[in-house]
């Protein structure tokens, strides 16, 4: 049964970063999943999370774009900044309305300076490359990030949606503290190569969309209530031809959660937590009650037999549809050219 609990602390990676064992993904507070939440309500939710022990806050310069960081900046005033571990990201540019993945040194530096200004902070705790620029050797991008650490603008470096080979190459330039990847009961392809690579190198794992973008919270009926500007409407797994298949997975998880005395969302989150103390899920929400429910997932204990049952339920064939549309870059197409090919412009 899921009970109220204290949010424990974990070491993320092996460079000294300590975070709450569950974070808060802030993307949905300023759109993407429908309309933005009113600013006062969004700030109240962030403050409630921090007061509850969820101090690891995740944002990005492309959420909004930019408005999410501005919101966080307002929420962190009056001494709140010192209570949190702040993570943001760079690498997806929307200049002139066109999306472009960028990782050249000049862009890395400009993006960091802009994020510092929007967040109204002097240093970012964890700075991720949101998507990998496959035109720029990862060593070049990492070199500029290393300089930002030396200058005190960021404390730790992270990668998001990076392949195992890209992670290895990046790690030779400067230790990677965390890799952010989608990991949930319906997204498990990272278990084959990326998770073992992170563990070999002492890199923490941050799981985004641990509830399957809300699927394990609401099930297939979620689709009926999506706003027209909710980007999930375009995702393959939420298309009706795939949803009819995917709802079977939800029904099995729901039945198991009922026996367990928790919600399907809590069971799905507990499964991620049980992957190890080097894993930190960052579920997002716009409702305080859902935030409280997510925190209670930390109290759900799963036996080895229950973990095995869940993993049997959540085999790859139980999920139909890709994670993203074909145009969205992921770790599967994130390898970069060799360093020897680089000629700075």
Curated annotation (Swiss-Prot):
User: Mind telling me which residue stretches traverse the membrane in this protein?
Assistant: none
Indicate which residues the UniProt annotation says bind substrate.
130
| CC terms in the record's Gene Ontology section | chloroplast envelope; plasma membrane
Q: Which InterPro entries match?
A: Aldo-Keto_reductase, NADP_OxRdtase_dom, NADP_OxRdtase_dom_sf
Where are the active-site residues found? 63 (proton donor)
- Molecular function terms from GO: oxidoreductase activity
Q: Which residues bind NADP(+)?
A: 209-219
Instruction: Give its E.C. classification number.
Output: 1.1.1.-
Keywords from UniProt, A to Z, are: NADP, Oxidoreductase
PANTHER family, per this entry? AFLATOXIN B1 ALDEHYDE REDUCTASE, ALDO-KETO REDUCTASE YAKC [NADP(+)]
Family membership, please give it. Answer: Belongs to the aldo/keto reductase family.
From the Swiss-Prot or TrEMBL record, give the protein name: Probable aldo-keto reductase 3
């Amino acid at each position: 049964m899921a009970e109220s609990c204290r949010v424990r602390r974990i070491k993320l990676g092996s460079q000294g970063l300590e975070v709450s064992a569950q974070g808060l993904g802030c993307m949905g507070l300023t759109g993407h999943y429908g309309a933005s939440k009113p600013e006062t309500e969004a700030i109240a939710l962030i403050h409630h999370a921090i007061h509850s022990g969820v101090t690891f806050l995740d944002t990005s310069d492309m959420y909004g774009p930019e408005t999410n960081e501005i919101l966080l900046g307002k929420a962190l005033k009056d001494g709140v900044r010192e209570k949190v571990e702040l993570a943001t990201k760079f690498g997806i540019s929307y200049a002139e309305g066109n999306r472009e993945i960028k990782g050249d040194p000049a862009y890395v530096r400009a993006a960091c300076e802009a994020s510092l200004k929007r967040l109204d902070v002097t240093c970012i705790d964890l700075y991720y490359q949101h998507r990998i620029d496959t035109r720029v050797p990862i060593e070049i991008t990492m070199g500029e990030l290393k300089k930002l650490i030396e200058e005190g603008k960021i404390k730790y470096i992270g990668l998001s949606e990076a392949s195992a080979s890209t992670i290895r190459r990046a790690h030779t330039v400067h230790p990677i503290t965390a890799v952010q990847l989608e990991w949930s009961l319906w997204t498990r392809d990272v278990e084959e190569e990326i998770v073992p690579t992170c563990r070999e190198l002492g890199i923490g794992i941050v799981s985004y969309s641990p509830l399957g973008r809300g699927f394990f919270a609401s099930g297939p009926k979620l689709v009926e209530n999506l706003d027209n500007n909710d980007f999930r409407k375009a995702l393959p797994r939420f298309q009706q031809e795939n949803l009819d298949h995917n709802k079977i997975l939800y029904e099995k998880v729901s039945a198991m959660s009922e026996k367990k005395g928790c919600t399907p969302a809590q069971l799905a989150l507990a499964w991620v937590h049980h992957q190890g103390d080097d894993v930190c899920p960052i579920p997002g929400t716009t409702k305080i009650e859902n935030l409280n429910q997510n925190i209670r997932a930390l109290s759900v204990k799963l036996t080895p037999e229950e973990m095995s049952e869940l993993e049997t339920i959540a085999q790859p064939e139980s999920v139909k549809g890709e994670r993203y549309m074909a145009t969205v870059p992921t770790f599967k197409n994130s390898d970069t050219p060799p360093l020897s090919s680089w000629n700075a412009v």
